[in-house]
Every structure is written in structure tokens, then in C-alpha cells.
């Protein structure tokens, strides 16, 4: 698979990792959840990303997860593998392993967290990962999690690199507009913020890498279709009703809220792994009321404005 395969993907779901109560991966829960996503307009799937609780997964567990999902998906939509860490050497070794494993359209590599590299350090980091294999690389720029921000200027330097094909951008709409205006033609720009998807698509982004698509894929698809048909009034009306649901899904450290909703819907998402904990019972009930029932009053006591998924 290639850039062209991903170019057709508007809604890429950042897949949760289902766990048993003892913390082991619940592989039996994967088929039903995958079929649910594909039935509700997921165009591609990201595995072993932040929403998958990747900091708590070993590389061996990630490879097991990859195999299980590939078996169910069976080529129906493109898959992206989370491959990056804050250790360049480890990222290089894992991207080689994933490339050899096969079956992925791209690897997602996050901006290095905690060690706070310079712009040149980040440039060299991603260049080294891209050079390590023929697996196309998408950069994940999320300063709310990693502390440092890859600037648009550095991003555009990397966009010219042959094996770097896109970015999951979680900085600002201003940065996104600048990147869209100045990027090479074959460079994908996704927002990683569900609440910004309406604005990003109107700016010319390629799509969203989403948490909300686990539970609200139909609404997102309807909104994107309205945008494509230049029906801004309809798209904006959907967005206004969608925002409270996004707020609810990020009102507690993610992916705890979306797992609470999926468990309620009958999918065995299970708990989170420490250090993340499930949403408290009363909070989970409010989240479910908003996301499933559209009961926007349920979240007003604790959520105002637009929450950004910095956590």
C-alpha cells in the first residue's frame, strides 16, 4: 500500500487495545470491534498509537496486536502502525521489524517526548527513521503530550524527504493552514483532534486520525460528506452537536472515556492499563449520556468550551 491508498482515507480510527480485567490483551474482542468500525465509515486504522495505550505495550504485544487485526481486516482498509518512541535507535529497530512484518501502509512516529530535542535533533530523528526501511512514515506532532513542538518550517523540511508522506498535526489550525498551503503535493495532512476536524477539512486537510470514530463515525462521515458537497450549513449543524460528544470523550484521560462508551455499547474494550485508570462510575455515566444519547446537559457541570486532547 502507498500514499495513494491513504489519500482516500478521510476517517482513520486510532484503535483502542482491548484488555481483560487482568491487563492482558483481549484478542477475542478485536473482531467485533473491527467490524463495528468498518460498518460505521472507518477508512483506515492506526494500531499501537496513543489511544492504544502504546506506552504500556511491549513490542512483542504490538506485533501480536498487528497480526490479530490484520487477520480480521484482511486488506479491506489500510493500516498504520505506531513505530516511534523518544529513542531513535529503538525506533529504527522497530520500524525495520514492522517493515519486515508487512501489511502496513505507513508507520506513525511521534515527536520525541521527555528528552526535549531541538528542531535539528527532531529533523535528524525522523530522517533516521525514514532511512531505516521502505515503510512510509507519518509524523505525529502533539506538543501537549511531548512538550516540544515540531515547527511548520521543520515539518516542511521533512515533507520533502522521500519516505516521509504525512503528518498527524495537533498544534493549531494556523499551523495546519500554513502546512496545507506550502506542502509538497503528495504529502498527507491529518488533524489528530476530533474537535478540529470540521475546520481542518475546510482548510484542505486530508482527514482525521480519530478517537471519536469508535463511537460516532456516522456523524463524522455525514459531516465530511456535507463539506465535500459544499453544504456548510449542514456540516456546521453537525459540528455543533458533535463538539459536546468530543468534549465528553476527552473529559478524562483518554482512552478511558471511549472505553467506557464501548463497554456500554457491548464491545469488550475492558479497562485501561496503569498508570491510566478507568473513568469513575458517575463520570462514565455522564460521558455515555452525552456520546450515546446526545444528552448535552449531562456534561455542562464539568466541561465547557472545546477540550483539546493534550492528555
UniProtKB/Swiss-Prot annotation:
Quote the catalytic activity from the record. L-aspartate 4-semialdehyde + pyruvate = (2S,4S)-4-hydroxy-2,3,4,5-tetrahydrodipicolinate + H2O + H(+)
Where does it live in the cell? Answer: Cytoplasm
Q: What keywords were assigned to this record? A: Amino-acid biosynthesis, Cytoplasm, Diaminopimelate biosynthesis, Lyase, Lysine biosynthesis, Schiff base
The record's active-site residues are 140, 168
| Enzyme Commission number, as recorded | 4.3.3.7
GO terms for biological process, alphabetical:
diaminopimelate biosynthetic process; lysine biosynthetic process via diaminopimelate
Q: Name one GO molecular function term.
A: 4-hydroxy-tetrahydrodipicolinate synthase activity
Q: Which residues make up the binding site for pyruvate?
A: 51, 209
Concerning Pfam families, the annotation shows: DHDPS
Which residues does this entry assign to the site Part of a proton relay during catalysis?
Answer: 50, 114
Query: Record's Gene Ontology CC terms?
Result: cytosol
Stored SMART domains: DHDPS
Coiled-coil-forming residues are none
The record's PROSITE patterns line, in alphabetical order, gives: DHDPS_2 (PS00666)
The pathway is: Amino-acid biosynthesis; L-lysine biosynthesis via DAP pathway; (S)-tetrahydrodipicolinate from L-aspartate: step 3/4
In terms of HAMAP family, this protein maps to: DapA
What family does the entry list?
A: Belongs to the DapA family.
Q: How does it assemble?
A: Homotetramer; dimer of dimers.
Q: What does this protein do?
A: Catalyzes the condensation of (S)-aspartate-beta-semialdehyde [(S)-ASA] and pyruvate to 4-hydroxy-tetrahydrodipicolinate (HTPA).
Any idea what this protein is called? 4-hydroxy-tetrahydrodipicolinate synthase
Gene symbol?
dapA
